[in-house]
Amino acid sequence: MSGAGNRSSAKADGGGRTPAPVGLVFDDRFLTHNTGLGLVGDVAIYPFADPIAHPSSPELVGRAKHLMDLHGITDRMTRIPAYEAADDALLAYHTPEHLARVHALDRTGGDAGEGSPMGVGGERVARLAVGAVMAAVDAVMDGHAGSAYALVRPPGHHAMAGRGMGFCVFNNIVVAARHAQRVHHAEKVLIVDWDVHHGNGTQDAFYADPSVLFISLHEDDLYPVGWGAAEQAGAGVGEGFTVNIPLPSGTGAAGYRAAFERLVLPIARRFSPDLVMVSAGQDANAFDPLGRMALTTGSYREMTRMLRSVADDTCAGRMVLAQEGGYAPTYAPYCSAAIAETLVGPETLAEPIPEPYGPRADSTPSARSVGLDCARALAAATAVQKRYWAI
């Protein structure tokens, strides 16, 4: 499988043009997404459990935006206004019944599916999150920005067609990818999901679709259970266009780098997309309460650079990143800011984003070398994908 040839208009001209602006989509209304309170553990097991802030509190993206402001990153980005996704856009994936449920919950608050809390007035915020990623696509496909980062809440990659799931109400990146195809005529879209949890909703949407290549790097057997095995590679004409790379707990920079070099980059380049999209969750960081991986800000910089190189080589640099997970209250915002800093170029900043834990953060064994369990996982994923790709 090598993928169809690209439209000539989608490729970089190599003429040394001035880099296009980097876009940012952020709206203060995201901070009104009301996830309510959570519990430390299950009350059946921990009768002393106390309510705490929900892990997906929108305060985290607010902190990330504040950090980006303090370091002058947002000054070097073009602001892109978000808009609320309309029914016709949402119905490209979601069912009318799900839209009706979310609309009803707008008056009462509640759960939009399985663990997808929203408060009173939450429908507009959820539609705004989808529209923010769509607006990023608009800006990149129309040439107003070369790349764009949608810093949104609520996240989206777990949402299924008929229900929310895993803190996600609507599937932001799925709807935006369909928007890129329907409105901007992007024939082939690459979606890379590096969130620690598998993007089950995104896989579901495109499992039988050869026009969207979905690549997921995630912690093996975490959430949701039953999704993301290496053998899940697509169905029908879409077989070979789903690439699952489940990685063992504790995988760090070296393992992710190897996954990119052996699988992500060669397959992405052979697919040769018209648009690169990223479900840019940061919960694979070493300090996240909902994952057990070992990435640092440096890891997110490196993955961003590698995918930008794919976009530069295949589709004139067009890349859209959408915020997904990331729950470490103090560390996740640094990861978000590191991604944005990489897009604008750290050399343009008077004060680049520091690694909060200094050089020692990238000196652990998992940062320096690929462990045996990780090597086995990569070998298994590679064996599956060799059926479809010359890698």
Q: Where are the model-predicted features located?
A:
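N-terminal low-complexity, Ser/Thr- and acidic-residue-enriched intrinsically disordered segments
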Residues: 2-89
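A general "terminal functional-core" signal
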Residues: 2-25, 30-31, 100-391
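Short secondary-structure transition/capping motifs
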Residues: 53, 57, 79, 88-91, ...
